[in-house]
Curated annotation (Swiss-Prot):
It comes from Escherichia coli (strain K12). It comes from the Bacteria. GO terms for biological process: DNA integration; DNA recombination. Keywords: DNA integration, DNA recombination, Plasmid, Repressor, Transcription, Transcription regulation. Acts as a repressor of transcription and as a site-specific resolvase that cleaves at the RfsF site. This is Resolvase. Disulfide bonds: none annotated. One of its GO terms (molecular function) is DNA binding. SUPFAM superfamilies: DNA breaking-rejoining enzymes. The active site is at R82, K114, H202, R205, H228, Y237. Pfam families: Phage_integrase.
Amino acid sequence: MSGSVIHSQSAVMVPAVYSAGQPASLPVAIDYPAALALRQMSMVHDELPKYLLAPEVSALLHYVPDLHRKMLLATLWNTGARINEALALTRGDFSLAPPYPFVQLATLKQRTEKAARTAGRMPAGQQTHRLVPLSDSWYVSQLQTMVAQLKIPMERRNRRTGRTEKARIWEVTDRTVRTWIGEAVAAAAADGVTFSVPVTPHTFRHSYAMHMLYAGIPLKVLQSLMGHKSISSTEVYTKVFALDVAARHRVQFAMPESDAVAMLKQLS
């Protein structure tokens, strides 16, 4: 078994991801209060994506006590994967060897769209994939820890067919994941922590996109990471981000009226 994929022997025991012992610093240098205010501005437009900022995601993960559940949500946050893409992941889809660990995601939405245009099942070997770097060392370490603790196999026998298949890391449904999120949101609310946007599996995808834009990732690169067929799908995030850029320039329109009158008189 290659050392480049997740395996129990390479597990590193570290404190829980986003634990209280970590320094309280933002992963991307942003003005968090200003970013919150600007997001409130964007929420006026129903067509714009609803997203969480990094501190909110970390706070939400704090209320997910189970490591297996926590790492699924962390995977959505760290990769921007669609929920069906994340639930399809196996250990072999991850390459965690330094210096550039990454995950290979099957771009399932594009596959579905293509299948709808053609008769029959999509031929094997033609499934679209994309590589997403895993740049957060805490995430990588916790993923290794989870696999080691839960002894997640590379393969398992399908009880229905009797065939040996690649074992999915998260053998759950979309509905189950939504239940996990709902329980975390409820636990946070009971502790006095609330979120101003509804949290669903897709919220993490939107949050990933906005986080990457805040980090300065070019739009074309983000398109590739998100698995968007058209750049127009990615550009929707810049409509939100444009509010931040414009606000930070603090463009002034007013000047003392008496000074303006004096200036015009001098020029005439």
